[in-house]
Amino acid sequence: FGPDGRLYFTLWRPSRGMSQLWTLQVNKNTQKMIEVKDILAKDQKKQNIDELLKLLGHTDRRIRQQAQFALVARGEIKALRILAMNRKAELLPRLHSLWGLGQLKYKDSDFLAVLCADDSDELRAQAARWAGELRFDPENRIPVMLRDPSPRVQLMAGIACGKLKSKNALGALEELIVSAKNKDPILRHAGVTGLVGAATLRELESFVGHP
């Protein structure tokens, strides 16, 4: 999809022949299409912080990402942190704030503690992902999330434990794999990925005869 609201596509051909470029669009420009086109064309260097934070909740992902990258370029850690922890805010702005902080390599144990206890399953999951990518978990909160009631959180926590090389997670990772019962390949993958990253070769060999 282009910023003008059109769908751009080509027809696939099995031969090496060239295909024409086609576009589809509604009969007339809608107000939403015009708005998206105008916002994407704006110079975000001239927009203030509040305007950019508001755009983190826009329905168009390109606009949300553009606002996120603009806030990251300005190093707006404080504004992003406040929004990410605000439980009254909508989910998308909070997620983009967290992702922006990840881009800035922001690390803070209190911040991680707040997000790990959030009511939103997806925010907890993304907090685990954030911790894993930054290799940051000074209080060993991520292994605990392997027993989170949300499978989505368990998935992200399992992968993160591997990146963190968390020895405290070995038992919980084993439980995660066993609980998957070869019926949930996604959770099994998370558990195996976690073990491969966190366990030594000798520790992995100890699982060979696991029932």
Where are these regions (language model features)?
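Extracellular/periplasmic ectodomains of large secreted or surface enzymes and adhesion receptors
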Residues: 1-211
